[in-house]
């Protein structure tokens, strides 16, 4: 029984080492591709190489979008409008259409940025306190929408992020 357990453990350890090496190879490949692309997004605290590469890959050419709202709609970070006459619903859901991979990268990047950047942290905290229902999810989606505005402007102007004073 011990031989079987030892053999299974050695196979598992060898598999983990092989996977670790593959991760290193993939990280190097991402870095090589990022050298070609301007590092505008990695200048934002909390956005590393993986999020930056993912966002840029999913957006593609930023010049095909006229406004940040178009990027947000492409990512699916917009809400349904429920209205009839003068009535407009207070609670509405985010649309399910859009590029789900871009939405994932933007939401995860927003979650990371809110931890590293004080302006995004304040914005997240403000949105968190506004409602009682779905607080984190809503605040994170709105923070991601704020991040879309920043990403759009940085990529469009091809410049680095400079955090505001204060």
Which role does the model predict for each range below?
Residues 1-166:
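A detector of single, family-specific signature residues
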